[in-house]
């Protein structure tokens, strides 16, 4: 199948959802996209932060799982995103939570506002497009163990896993910054 990736001519970066590497495409040109049976091609536009929870059998079960983030950097090394959280059941929401994400200068910032208390922890953060080896990784100034950090220099992917113990009160219980 052929497709065009918008914005390539102006420096927009796209990442393959599955292998998390930057797409090699030319501006204004059809790019062949592999789409065998059973595979849906999905791409992430650089400059986006995507919150995730594990897909489970029910909404209620999913609501009780840890959070993960994928930050896909643009060519300037930045990204933004927003997460809206409520109880998932009420028709009229009395308490909600809005979390803003910003990546700038080798740091991911999360800032929440609202009255809804989401107690699910943050498990993992994946940053796509990290062009150089990260330094010490910290969450709110506390060192993340080296065993929890991996960097793929070829794919330019930074993965930070096992953050549950550092976010036991809930991923969005307080504002935080992850630096690398």
Predicted regions and their residues:
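Short beta-strand element of the conserved SAM-dependent methyltransferase core
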Residues: 43-45, 101, 149, 170, ...
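Solvent-exposed, conformationally flexible loop/turn segments
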Residues: 25-30, 166-173
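A generic structural signal for beta-strand entry/edge sites
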Residues: 105-109, 122, 153-158, 175
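C-terminal accessory domains/tails appended to large, multi-domain proteins
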Residues: 125-133, 143-144, 163, 172-173, ...
């Amino acid at each position: 199948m052929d497709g065009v990736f918008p914005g390539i001519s102006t420096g927009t970066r796209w990442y393959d959802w599955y292998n998390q590497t930057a797409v090699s495409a030319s501006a204004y040109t059809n790019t062949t996209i592999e789409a065998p049976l059973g595979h849906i091609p999905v791409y992430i536009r650089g400059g986006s932060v995507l919150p995730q929870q594990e897909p489970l059998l029910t909404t209620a079960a999913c609501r009780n799982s840890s959070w993960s983030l994928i930050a896909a950097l643009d060519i300037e090394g930045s990204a933004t995103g927003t997460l809206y959280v409520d109880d998932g059941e009420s028709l009229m929401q009395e308490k909600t939570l809005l979390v803003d994400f910003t990546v700038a200068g080798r740091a991911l910032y999360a800032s929440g506002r609202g009255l809804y208390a989401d107690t699910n922890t943050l498990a993992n953060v994946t940053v796509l497009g990290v062009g150089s080896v990260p330094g010490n990784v910290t969450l709110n100034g506390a060192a993340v163990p080296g065993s929890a950090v991996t960097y793929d220099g070829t794919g330019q992917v930074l993965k930070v896993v096992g953050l549950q113990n550092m976010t036991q009160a809930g991923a969005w219980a307080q504002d935080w910054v992850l630096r690398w």
